[in-house]
């Protein structure tokens, strides 16, 4: 049996690569508009980073990570998300010593061993933003404005819902967790086994459980917004005011807790037809948790596979770039030499040029040129070389003409 791609992975073929380039270019552009610069972190990290950063009781750490021991006996994990590695890089490279806030974005593959679903594979790709050094609600609103602008204006997606919540600070959550435990007590026996463990260690994680029975139980659970302190409530009010002044619509959803333990205060999700397009929030204690200085932070992740799926389902076309501007057909060895020289010079002038590498007949060459969408076809033979001329056909209307083999004249025609 032939070796195949592993379950949960997918090849990105040349016919699809331009779609990825398109969305990455759009996201790079809007990142630059907000003064956000790129970071690249390794594909694998110490397992301890994710245990401490993401949270021991999360599904990600308990069930989904690709973890192995390397030849040096170190526990290594393929990164399941982008925030913890960005935090590690922020600390290790002393970026906290720079002028704050520090704004960074990334494109990264992530790996999670989870049940595959629409738009989600075991190897998937994320665009993420992390902002360090500001505790102000204004930075949260700024990042949310970027998200909604990118999705609605740059990509033209309709029917999106921005849902926000506040998880408060550790003191708020302690009060909420007690109230939540009191509520869950009478349904304890109906919880899944994982949530029974969470009941004592981290009851708020039960709200994020994907099991149907647990989802039903938490529908009427207390709202954390009834337990946040005055400072956290003020932060949430300011966030809403900033969103209002920018004209960004939102819904308040007290059941958004996100699947990772590091979140505090603001959390959000962008929903389309019941699926989460992207999500994130504030994590003011994570940098300190992984041995850095006390640093407030905010970030989010956007799944690129899911984004491409939505664009396809919405019928939003991604413009396909011209693959070949000039195809140079040749007859004979001398003509092939001239074709090679001409293609080289056209490429130097920034023109996409192709020649025959299979020894095809001129008819077959022209058929191939049409198949790859060449805008112009050239034909060179011995007579053209002797007369220092070349035959050109404009494929859009079929017009044919002869011009000198002078590269400057040819460039002026096809550009």
UniProtKB/Swiss-Prot annotation:
Keywords: Aminoacyl-tRNA synthetase, ATP-binding, Cytoplasm, Ligase, Nucleotide-binding, Protein biosynthesis. It catalyses: tRNA(His) + L-histidine + ATP = L-histidyl-tRNA(His) + AMP + diphosphate + H(+). GO terms for biological process: histidyl-tRNA aminoacylation. It is an enzyme of class 6 (ligase). It comes from the Bacteria. GO terms for molecular function: ATP binding; catalytic activity, acting on a protein; histidine-tRNA ligase activity; transferase activity. Its main location: cytoplasm. GO terms for cellular component: cytoplasm. It is found in: Cytoplasm. The keyword Glycoprotein does not apply. Its EC number is 6.1.1.21. Homodimer. HAMAP family: His_tRNA_synth. Belongs to the class-II aminoacyl-tRNA synthetase family. This is Histidine--tRNA ligase.
């Amino acid at each position: 049996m032939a070796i195949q791609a592993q379950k949960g992975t997918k090849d990105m073929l040349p016919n699809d690569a331009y779609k990825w380039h398109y969305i990455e270019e759009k996201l790079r552009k809007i990142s630059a508009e907000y003064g956000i610069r790129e970071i690249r972190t390794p594909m694998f990290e110490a397992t301890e980073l994710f245990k401490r950063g993401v949270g021991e009781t999360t599904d990600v750490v308990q069930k989904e990570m690709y973890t192995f021991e390397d030849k040096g006996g170190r526990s290594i994990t393929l990164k399941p998300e982008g925030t913890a590695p960005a935090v590690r890089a922020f600390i290790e490279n002393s970026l906290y010593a720079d002028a704050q806030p520090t704004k960074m974005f990334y494109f990264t593959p992530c790996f999670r061993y989870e049940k595959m679903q629409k738009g989600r594979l075991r190897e998937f790709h994320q665009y993420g933003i992390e902002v360090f050094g500001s505790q102000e609600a204004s930075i949260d609103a700024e990042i949310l404005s970027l998200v909604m602008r990118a999705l609605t204006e740059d990509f033209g997606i309709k029917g999106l819902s921005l849902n926000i919540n506040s998880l408060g600070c550790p003191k708020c959550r302690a009060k909420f967790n007690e109230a939540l435990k009191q509520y869950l007590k009478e349904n304890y026996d109906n919880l899944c086994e994982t949530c029974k463990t969470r009941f004592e260690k981290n009851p708020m994680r039960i709200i994020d459980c994907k099991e149907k029975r647990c989802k039903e139980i938490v529908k009427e659970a207390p709202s954390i917004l009834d337990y946040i302190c005055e400072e956290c409530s003020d932060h949430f009010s300011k966030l809403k005011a900033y969103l209002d002044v920018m004209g960004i619509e939102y819904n308040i959803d007290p059941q958004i807790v996100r699947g990772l333990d590091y979140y505090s205060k603001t959390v959000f999700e962008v929903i389309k037809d019941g699926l989460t397009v992207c999500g994130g929030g504030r994590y003011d204690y994570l940098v300190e948790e992984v041995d850095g200085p006390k640093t407030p932070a905010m970030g989010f992740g956007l799944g690129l596979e899911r984004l491409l799926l939505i664009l396809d389902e919405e019928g939003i076309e991604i413009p396909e770039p011209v693959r070949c501007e000039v195809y140079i057909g040749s007859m004979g060895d001398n003509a092939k030499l001239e074709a090679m020289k001409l293609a080289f010079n056209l490429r130097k002038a920034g023109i996409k040029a192709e020649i025959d590498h299979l020894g095809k007949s001129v008819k077959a060459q022209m058929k191939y040129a049409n198949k790859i969408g060449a805008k112009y076809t050239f034909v060179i033979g011995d007579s053209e070389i002797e007369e220092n001329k070349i035959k050109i056909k404009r494929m859009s209307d079929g017009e044919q003409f002869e011009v000198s083999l002078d590269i400057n004249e040819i460039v002026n025609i096809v550009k």
